[in-house]
Amino acid sequence: MCGIVGYIGAQQAQDILLDGLSRLEYRGYDSAGIAVMDGGVIRLSKAKGRLANLAARVASNPLPGTIGIGHTRWATHGEPNDINAHPHTDMKGHIAVVHNGIIENYEELRAQLKAKGCVFVSETDTEVIAHLLHTLYDGDMLSTILRAQTMLEGSYALCVLNAEAPDTLYCTRKDSPLVVGLSDGAQYVGSDIPALIRHTRTVELLDEREVAVLTRSGVRVYDHFGNERALKPIHVDWDVEAAEKGGYAHFMLKEIHEEPAALKKTFSAHVDAEKMAIRPGAFPISAEEANSLRTLTIVACGTAYHAGVVGKYVIEKLARLPVVVDVASEFRYRNPILSAGDCFLAISQSGETADTLAAMREAERLGAKVMALTNVVGSSIARTAGDCVMYTYAGPEIAVASTKAYITQVEMMVLLAIDLGVKRGHLTESVASELLRQMSDIPTLAEQVMALEPAVQRFSSLYHDRQHVFYIGRGLDNALAMEASLKLKEVSYIMSEAYAAGELKHGTIALIEQGTLVCALLTQEQLADKTLSNVREVKSRGAKVLIVCPEALRDRAAKDADELWVIPDAASDLLPLLAIIPVQLFAYYMAVSRGCDVDKPRNLAKSASLARSLPSRRCATPKAAASSARRKKAAGACPCCPWPGPTWAAAGARPPSPSRPCLWRWYC
């Protein structure tokens, strides 16, 4: 979900590149860079952090030239810093590359290229591409790119500069979007239309593995065999805001539609598709550790907590490991029982959730093995976990309500369960391989679920005036109901609650009256009859019932449903990955029908603010802070934070040491 721009024309490239990158900021990023070529010399400028940092560097050290490429990076390999920022070059600086996507075999290629004498300066998979192109280069960059494609496994959108072709820009794509903008005397490239729309509304869409060769006079497109094809330009009528949303009305809807791609990326990053096995090192726990574990404690907030509840079900089932799931804001205050031999897993989309971060440090203090699952490389939680961090590959989420981050977190819970199940001897490799094979089909099945959208929209328009909505389910469906209910109340402001279906008779059924809307999640075949009996209980009291079920349960569910949404069949442990999609769409369309601000619900923000027990992000005034730092450093205290003190003790922090810097340094 990084941003790519490219330009060749008569104007100074740096200004157009920076403008294009600014129009892709909504995608999220942690660093940015540009490369401009002039007279066969490629010059780079890169900066960590906001685009303004890069713009300031370019302003003080301009990059002259009328051809260039640019990139905003969302880290997937290597932490966010200037070195890992794109563009990347070969050793001689003759080839520059920007890249979106994930090269799955980059470690293998990196080893091969090192053996040939290539020297790497970054931790990224992208630098591998630059060295590979240099190694393969035979004087014809088009044929070089085509040969490189046969060696690259994974997804990529590439823009390439070649010092030996100073008036040509090359780009190609596979499983990652890339758009070419056409105009007289100038051509443009963007990973998304907003980067181009100020300059041209005529675009050429590249198919898989096609290569576009851009010159000032025009664009030529070749298939992966090297055959040129005729251009098929289209005209774009979107306004800029609509372009940022990819033509969708809201980011939330766009991100729901991005879920199949996010599922595919996360799966590919952790599973060897040829062997259909978890990649070695994908999960930071050895077989010896897995077999010695007593318990696993999962701690998270909000949507991530609900992913953890799914994790409890699948890990206990497949790995036979006791799992406790706790709300991060409560964890520290219940005097948790953890020690060596226990494992702690923190889940956070942003990697900055303060309560979750504080819980991690408490678990670390108690001696547990601490792991983390996050979507953001280099985040506070990722840094705290160190080598024990796992990543989802959902890409940035702009909408406040999490959708694709949740679905990839659930996917990771299933993958972790399989990995632990094999290592603990409760799953044979053949059974695990078959389950992974079925998981590989989930992105395609998720695309099929999107066909329910018109039915969801119609139903929402009829029921958007409801004041209360209840979700029920059993087992995994109960965990799913919790997230479905949160999503609805979060964006539509409808009072919604989720209940284990068997608990209705213990009080909740008193709230059911004529016209009450009840959504029953019915994916677990072995529990279907019991859940349907609860459905009949609420129907007999006047409820309107919506049922979400797989094809295999269609006939049984249809008898009791006022509305039925049917998803494709899959293994029972994988069905939550499909069933969540229609209820996310339901929350979205209910909110739209009620006129709510879908992307920015009232009173909510994307990442949680710091817990009150944590220190301020900012130190005192610079002069006072510097003076205080010198005194405190001499005294052996933290030079930037109020350590020691009652606030820190209450937060459960430990004193820093030379081998262990201040745990709280990220807040200063």
Regions found by a protein language model. Give the residues of each.
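Conserved short alpha-helical segments that host acidic/polar catalytic motifs at enzyme active sites
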Residues: 1-245, 249-250, 254, 258-294, ...
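Short, strongly hydrophobic transmembrane alpha-helices
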Residues: 655-668
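Short, membrane-interfacial amphipathic segments enriched in basic
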Residues: 630-643
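Generic C-terminus detector
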Residues: 226, 252, 544, 557, ...
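Active-site phosphate/pyrophosphate-binding segments
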Residues: 259-263, 267-297, 388-517, 591-614
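Glycine-rich phosphate-binding loops that contact phosphosugars or nucleotide phosphates
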Residues: 288-441, 521-563, 586
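Glycine-rich oxoanion-binding loops at beta->alpha junctions
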Residues: 66, 70-83, 269-287, 311-347, ...
